[in-house]
Regions:
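Catalytic cores of nucleotide-enabled group-transfer and carboxylate-activating enzymes in metabolic
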Residues: 10-13, 32-44, 51-72, 82-84, ...
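Short beta-strand segments
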Residues: 121, 173, 257, 270, ...
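Acyltransferase donor/substrate-recognition loop-hinge adjacent to the catalytic core
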Residues: 148-230
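Acyl-donor binding region in acyl/amide transferases
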Residues: 80-162, 232, 282-358
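Extreme N-terminal starter segment of soluble prokaryotic enzymes
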Residues: 2-3
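A conserved beta-strand-loop-helix scaffold within acyl/acetyltransferase catalytic domains
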Residues: 20-62, 70-80, 204-309
């Protein structure tokens, strides 16, 4: 017998957040989210998204043990933007038992009907900066620290529950060129584009010098990502929140902010050495000692995670991405990085995918947003 309990206190929330560590404890491909970030996302006093969202989360219990979890988010801002009253499901995990998955989704769908929603879709977060998409290909590959991992049986459960594909994201593994001729060729292209469009790269020796750029960075995120599935503009409070979250991840060697002649940001690329091993070792916890291994990962690593990349609409199709890629290539070469892993890219987003066409790549993962009409 499965019982569903709503998470209403901090002790239950800690169990909700920590459950994936138990479910995937023997799975080397699973990488936990940072524990503190997951906790704060559900805290109304710390997450500005609650200004326009309602959210609830539940645990599935059997014989006193957790056998599943699920969250749900009603984003009025997203529904207004996209013209559809939908409920998002998020952070869903469960054992391979249809009774459990059915009980979890029935609970979410019941709330959706109370809200007069026409559909349930996900997994999606409060914003596009959160984890999203259920893994449907690439189960043998280790996740990035900012993406979900799930068992293959989830797909069958979703189909049995009446959920179908809405959109897919793909991820690429890119081999970093090591030959000097390729690096120099990209540097020449970068120099040409910089001169032609009177642009320059914001040079910085450390993370602190990037801090004043984080607000215009997220303002450009709002502009460039606006047409993408499920996105909503980040508010000033959210920009402040995500700036604090992103600042420690910025590595000057693998980060590029491109500015125009008036020092306005026109493009960016942010990469960070992979934190997967460090977070696995400490179950997503930075304290008391997890932060030490995170710092080590920044200095000794063979993989860089490409977190975000975008170009202002006025500068698209002008070769500006070559500036970002050239700097990233040189930075990876300096750090001994052998491969780069992209974040999820919408499968129909040709603008983003086309920038990897000159590199040796492997599409190694695919994740999906499911939807069910009510």
């Amino acid at each position: 017998m499965v019982s569903i309990i709503e998470v209403t206190d901090k002790a239950q929330l800690r169990r909700f957040v920590d459950y994936p560590n138990e479910l995937y404890k023997d799975v080397p491909q699973f990488v936990p989210a940072t524990y503190g970030d997951d906790l704060s996302d559900w805290d109304r006093s710390k997450n500005p998204a609650f200004e326009y969202c309602d959210a609830r989360c539940w645990l599935a219990m059997r014989n006193g043990e957790i056998v599943g979890r699920i969250g749900a988010i009603h984003s009025r801002k997203a529904n207004d933007k996209w013209g559809a009253n939908r409920l998002r499901f998020t952070q869903v995990d469960f054992i391979d038992d249809p009774e459990v998955s059915s009980a979890l989704f029935r609970t979410v769908e019941a709330w959706a009907k109370e809200l007069d929603c026409t559909a349930v879709h996900g997994p999606l977060g409060f914003t596009d900066m959160d984890r999203e998409g259920m893994l449907v290909e690439g189960f043998d590959r280790r996740s990035c620290f900012f993406t979900y991992y799930n068992y293959p049986y989830y797909i069958d459960h979703m189909a049995a529950l009446g959920y179908a594909k809405d959109v897919d994201w793909i991820e690429e593994l890119i081999t970093v060129p090591e030959d000097e001729a390729t690096i120099q060729r990209w540097e020449k292209i970068s120099d040409f584009v910089l001169k032609r469009h009177r642009l320059h790269i914001h040079e910085a020796r450390n993370r602190l010098s990037y801090l004043p750029l984080l607000k215009p960075f997220f303002e450009l995120v709002n502009l460039a990502y606006a047409p993408l599935y499920g996105t909503v503009d980040l508010s000033d409070r959210q920009i402040k929140k995500y700036s604090a979250k992103f600042a420690p991840l910025i590595n000057p060697n693998t980060t590029c902010f491109v500015m125009d002649e008036n020092d306005r940001m026109v493009a960016f690329g942010v990469g960070a050495p992979s934190l997967a091993s460090a977070l696995q070792k400490h179950r997503g916890r930075l304290m008391p000692t997890g932060w030490i291994d995170v710092l080590k990962a920044f200095h000794r690593n063979d993989t860089v995670d490409l977190l975000l990349i975008a170009v202002h609409p006025d500068y698209q199709k002008k070769g500006v991405n070559a500036i970002i890629l050239s700097k990233a290539m040189k930075g990876c070469h300096k750090l001994g990085i052998k491969q780069a892993e992209t974040g999820p890219m919408l499968e129909l987003n040709d603008k983003v995918q086309s920038q990897w066409k000159d590199f040796q790549t492997e599409q190694h993962k695919r994740r999906r947003c499911f939807i069910k009409q009510l």
